[in-house]
A protein has these predicted regions:
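Peripheral peptide segments
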Residues: 1-142
């Protein structure tokens, strides 16, 4: 069984071009999710509002100011469809894989129905928690 963590991007970013894993390190929340994923999952990817699925140590990208928070439902559906296709291309939606979503509902709300149509198991360990509660959840497990 392979475990893959999916970590949402964050508003706080470095200003200079960086690898995706480093770009979001300005955010304490991202740092906690990253640390948890690196310690507990076999692989992890970043869910970017602008780029979709990013390899953490892939090519450097420029800082950007884009989020799904204010996106329409249709925009979120289009984004989710693109992310789903990217995950398929990475063979990340197979029967022997469990996806752990470390993101808010803006990032998984429209993606979850697509994932539920596959044989992949999906877990959202911090579902229903507020930001402070999520930080405490990660602190307790790192």
């Amino acid at each position: 069984m392979t475990e893959i963590g999916l970590v949402s991007c964050t508003k706080k970013k470095r200003e200079e071009s960086s690898s995706p894993a480093e770009l979001y390190m300005e955010s304490p929340y991202f740092r906690k999710m990253r640390e948890f994923c690196e310690a507990n999952h076999d692989l992890w990817y970043i869910l970017s509002a602008k780029y979709g699925v990013l390899e953490p140590y892939g090519e450097p990208i420029e800082s950007y100011n884009e989020t799904l928070r204010d996106s329409t439902v249709e925009e979120k559906r289009e984004w989710a469809k693109s992310v789903f296709e990217q995950l398929q291309a990475k063979d990340s939606l197979e029967k022997d894989i469990t996806l752990f979503i470390h993101a808010g509902k803006d990032y998984y709300g429209e993606l979850l129905p697509l994932l539920e149509q596959t044989d992949t198991e999906v877990r959202i360990p911090t579902e229903g928690l507020g930001l402070g509660e999520k930080m405490a959840w990660y602190n307790d497990r790192i």
